Amino acid sequence: MKFVKNDQTAVFALGGLGEIGKNTYAVQFQDEIVLIDAGIKFPEDELLGIDYVIPDYTYLVKNEDKIKGLFITHGHEDHIGGIPYLLRQVNIPVYGGKLAIGLLRNKLEEHGLLRQTKLNIIGEDDIVKFRKTAVSFFRTTHSIPDSYGIVVKTPPGNIVHTGDFKFDFTPVGEPANLTKMAEIGKEGVLCLLSDSTNSENPEFTMSERRVGESIHDIFRKVDGRIIFATFASNIHRLQQVIEAAVQNGRKVAVFGRSMESAIEIGQTLGYINCPKNTFIEHNEINRMPANKVTILCTGSQGEPMAALSRIANGTHRQISINPGDTVVFSSSPIPGNTISVSRTINQLYRAGAEVIHGPLNDIHTSGHGGQEEQKLMLRLIKPKFFMPIHGEYRMQKMHVKLATDCGIPEENCFIMDNGEVLALKGDEASVAGKIPSGSVYIDGSGIGDIGNIVLRDRRILSEEGLVIVVVSIDMDDFKISAGPDLISRGFVYMRESGDLINDAQELISNHLQKVMERKTTQWSEIKNEITDTLAPFLYEKTKRRPMILPIIMEV
């Protein structure tokens, strides 16, 4: 990193700035890089067919020998989902809490990377030392156990990364360690990187304990079957649902691979506790009274292939909605998922279920702190410089305002873009330069093989349709021997558009005869002539621009 001086610490992100997801941050001092998280981002609607988005790891691959380790703040997908794709390109040790490592272990096994990866479980009191830098941890509260903030000690000063956090004073699990945070602040912090997700919420975030009370209220009041959907990674929420089921004499059936895996890991690590006979097999749910059954499932985000979506649209093999069923959405829609969640809720209502959802029911709370919690973090850590992370630009902007309210000068606050490098030393900080960054699209097993041109083609196909032009040409005599024939898919209904098709065929035929008179032998030129002739004609007649695919056969 030539633009950073030898006595400066560099801080940068490959993902997570100006967006929700693909959180990947790094602290570099000279030849030592400490990597923090490697997450995925869920695609927005215009990314047709894309499964996930990860950062461009080019800089990390080129500097693999400098990476001392990857440190995980917690086990959510937007923080660990990219790790298998990163580890295909670099061989580095991974450090994290026992739950995060447990979730990651399953993920690496699926990708065939478990044997080659060195996994290290850390606790709050551990310190990982390298030649020039060291990494320590402090316990935070989030919507998943084993969440940590990270302190990277470098010669110019300490860099603190909060991870995702809230201050819950009646938590289900262990409370955040405010004492240690205050000690870190007292020792001195050069720069704070802090979670900006809920910076537009002026209040404290509701306690997870209050959600638990609402869950118990639902279980006491509902007589029929309860179908409960939430994030599989929200272990505390799963424990509270299971407790409510047990206390009300219900058995629990689990649907969804990620949910089954999370419960298995939670039980193994002691985060989920229940009597041995609590869980039942899938084939038992229809043999038991409705008021004795709870179904715990995935699909709270309206994912098309998740259990709840298939229940809602009637395609699930083992569960169909019965009169008296109550479906609980214990989540809020991730940006981009609002339409699919609404669709699922409507389908459930149409099928005859009662649906409990939304903020009025206190059945979900965020794992991210609001403004008062963000200000508390700022006052505990007391950084010299501040860099808001993990949020869209407006969230980062609001977080800077909170920082200035807490006494940090505005010129000491930096709203960064992915790839920009913040160079820090003593009383000085500046954006020193930029490294390669961007997005890599994952589609099935393909990684990075989907570019903007492919996405553009998918958009055209989805919105405008496809017209295939098939023509046979005798290249000896330069004459059309058959065709042109037109095939439409998603553009017009052929039987009802005979005049349009006939006119288009005649247009292409007349133009190709002129092309043949020039004795053209280049396939690409002939195809371009067909496209350039047909496209304006179709737009004039239909005001649509379908994708045109010429197929030329030589006779």
From Swiss-Prot:
Record GO terms (molecular function): 5'-3' RNA exonuclease activity; identical protein binding; RNA binding; RNA endonuclease activity; zinc ion binding
Location(s), subcellular: Cytoplasm
Binding site for substrate: H364, T365, S366, G367, H368
Activity regulation summary: 30S ribosomal subunit binding to Shine-Dalgarno sequences blocks exonuclease activity.
GO aspect biological process, one term: rRNA processing
Chain segments annotated as transmembrane: none
Stated induction or repression of this protein's expression: Part of the rpoY-rnjA operon, transcribed constitutively.
Amino-acid positions noted as binding Ca(2+) in the UniProt annotation, renumbered to this chain: G49, D51, D443
Cofactor needs: Ca(2+); Zn(2+)
Binding, Zn(2+) 1: H74, H76, H142, D164
Domain notes: The C-terminal domain (residues 450-555) are required for nuclease activity and dimerization.
Subunit structure, interactors included: Unclear whether it forms homodimers or belongs to a larger complex. According to probably does not form homodimers, while shows homodimer formation. Both reports show RNase J1 and J2 interaction, probably as a heterotetramer shows it is a component of a possible RNA degradosome complex composed of rny, rnjA, rnjB, pnp, pfkA and eno, while finds no evidence of an RNA degradosome complex.
Stated name of the protein: Ribonuclease J1
